[in-house]
Every structure is written in structure tokens, then in C-alpha cells.
């Protein structure tokens, strides 16, 4: 087990050296930005940023590949585009209209085994739309998915 911890620390250190530093963002009322005026975000911008659309999300690899629970991956999550956001009315929800597969190279290993590179495919959401919630409920009954024909 100490070997795995050492290897994980090594990967984190290596990642920190390779990736550029991300600048921190200041909030409107942070101590470094004291002002009596508060910027108001216009409605159109608020609407466009909150409406149903694909947004970058960090997704755990094991949640996409539950059969791989006995393995460790580096990184343990990947960045994918996923549908999220609000719809024009409460009876609707945001769902993918179009998806595409993306293949990523990851490092895979078991506790004492030598790590190796693998290529894994993930589904990304390309286009999203708002659909009625009743369509979602119609497809599931008592937690079991009904197959679509």
C-alpha cells in the first residue's frame, strides 16, 4: 500500500509541474475588490448561462465504468461535456439530444501491479434540449427502465 501512495504522490507532483498555474478569480465583493458599486448581470446573460446546455463536468471514471472498481485510475475523474441547466418551466428537464464518444488515455493499475496506459471511451453530450418530465417517468417504473422499441 505504501507503494501506491508514493506513486500517487509522484503523479500529483508531476502533474503540478507540467500543468500551468490557473490564476485565481476575484469575487465582486472580495477584499481586493472593495467598491460601493456592484455590477448587475443583465437578464439575457443570466438566462443564457443558466438555460439547458452542455457544460464541462468532472465525472468519476468508476461511475462510468462500475465494473472497474477493483482498479485505480489516474486521473480518477475526467472532464466531459454534460447536459445541465434550467428549462423554461418546472415540468421539463434538460436531456441530451446528441452525444459523441471521446476516447481518453488514462493510467490504470491495481494496488501492487505496475501501472499501464489504457484508452477508455466516454460519452459526451453535444446538444441538449428540454423535454417534459412525464417522458422520463413514462420510461421508468419502480426504478426499472422499460426498454424503448
Curated annotation (Swiss-Prot):
GO terms for molecular function: chemoattractant activity; growth factor activity; vascular endothelial growth factor receptor binding. One of its GO terms (biological process) is sprouting angiogenesis. It is found in: Secreted. Growth factor active in angiogenesis and endothelial cell growth, stimulating their proliferation and migration. It binds to the receptor FLT1/VEGFR-1. Also promotes cell tumor growth. PROSITE patterns: PDGF_1, PDGF_2. Disulfide bonds join 52-94, 83-128, 87-130. InterPro entries: Cystine-knot_cytokine (IPR029034), PD_growth_factor_CS (IPR023581), PDGF/VEGF_dom (IPR000072), PDGF/VEGF_growth_factor (IPR050507). CDD domains: PDGF. The keyword Chaperone does not apply. It comes from Bos taurus. GO terms for cellular component: extracellular space; membrane. This is Placenta growth factor. Antiparallel homodimer; disulfide-linked. Also found as heterodimer with VEGFA/VEGF. It holds the Pfam family PDGF. Residues 1-18 form the signal peptide. Glycans are attached at residues 33, 101. Belongs to the PDGF/VEGF growth factor family.
Amino acid at each position: 500500500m505504501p507503494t501506491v501512495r508514493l506513486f500517487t504522490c509522484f503523479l500529483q507532483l508531476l502533474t503540478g509541474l507540467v500543468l500551468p498555474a490557473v490564476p485565481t478569480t476575484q469575487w465582486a465583493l472580495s477584499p481586493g475588490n472593495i467598491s460601493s458599486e456592484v455590477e448587475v448581470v443583465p437578464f439575457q446573460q443570466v438566462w443564457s448561462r443558466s438555460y439547458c446546455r452542455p457544460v464541462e463536468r468532472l465525472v468519476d471514471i468508476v461511475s462510468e465504468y462500475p465494473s472497474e472498481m477493483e482498479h485505480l485510475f489516474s486521473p480518477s475523474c475526467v472532464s466531459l461535456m454534460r447536459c445541465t441547466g434550467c428549462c423554461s418551466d418546472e415540468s421539463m428537464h434538460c436531456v441530451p439530444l446528441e452525444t459523441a464518444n471521446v476516447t481518453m488515455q488514462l493510467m490504470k493499475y491495481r494496488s501492487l501491479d505496475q501501472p499501464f496506459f489504457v484508452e477508455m471511451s466516454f460519452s459526451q453530450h453535444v446538444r441538449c434540449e428540454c423535454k417534459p418530465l412525464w417522458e422520463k417517468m413514462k420510461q421508468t417504473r419502480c426504478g426499472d427502465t422499460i426498454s424503448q422499441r
